[in-house]
Amino acid sequence: MSVLKKPDLTDPKLRAKLAKGMGHNYYGEPAWPNDLLYIFPVVILGTLACVIGLSVLAPSPIGEKADPFATPLEILPEWYFFPTFNLLRVIPNKLLGVLSMAAVPVGLITVPFIESVNKFQNPFRRPVAMTVFVFSVVFAIWLGIGATMPINKALTLGLF
């Protein structure tokens, strides 16, 4: 049921485009009706069947009932907020804590202006960007691990 459009290789315009490495829109299998009517619905229905099947076969547990009068011993944020939570917890001045969190996007915005090389180059040829990236990832992991510890070990992780 698919429609196949064959190229007219005697057409001089098409031959000129093919010589330049272009012309892929003039031949081959068109998206309508082949992809849009036959392939996409199969993929969408297959994905829907997988999601419904998994939710029926392995439902997620509800857990224990919430008690509004029982406060947990330690309230921690989700794991992706651990570095910022630890930063706010460790810095005594809250204004400095908020400004240090605002310094992260400002620092990321300044990296392209500090290092003005071709953005399509190998990342290992961009030493400033790679140094900032590696340092910030290590620092975020360090702060994230420290957020799970008591406040007196939050920065040193109990190593020093």
From Swiss-Prot:
CC terms in the record's Gene Ontology section: chloroplast thylakoid membrane
Pfam families tied to this protein: Cytochrom_B_C
Cell compartments where the protein resides: Plastid, Chloroplast thylakoid membrane
Domain of life (superkingdom): Eukaryota
GO biological-process terms attached to the record: photosynthetic electron transport chain
The entry's keywords: Chloroplast, Electron transport, Membrane, Photosynthesis, Plastid, Thylakoid, Transmembrane, Transmembrane helix, Transport
Gene3D superfamilies in alphabetical order: plastocyanin oxidoreductase, Single helix bin
InterPro entries: Cyt_b/b6_C (IPR005798), Cyt_b/b6_C_sf (IPR036150), Cyt_b6/f_cplx_suIV (IPR005870), Cytochrome_b_C_euk/bac (IPR048260)
Transmembrane segments: 36-56, 95-115, 127-147
Translocase as UniProt keyword: no
Topology term for the membrane: Multi-pass membrane protein
One MF term in the entry's GO annotations: electron transporter, transferring electrons within the cyclic electron transport pathway of photosynthesis activity
Keyword flag Thylakoid: yes
Family annotation (CDD domains): cytochrome_b_C
Subunit structure: The 4 large subunits of the cytochrome b6-f complex are cytochrome b6, subunit IV (17 kDa polypeptide, petD), cytochrome f and the Rieske protein, while the 4 small subunits are petG, petL, petM and petN. The complex functions as a dimer.
Family: Belongs to the cytochrome b family. PetD subfamily.
HAMAP family assigned: Cytb6_f_subIV
Record's function text: Component of the cytochrome b6-f complex, which mediates electron transfer between photosystem II (PSII) and photosystem I (PSI), cyclic electron flow around PSI, and state transitions.
Protein's name in the database: Cytochrome b6-f complex subunit 4
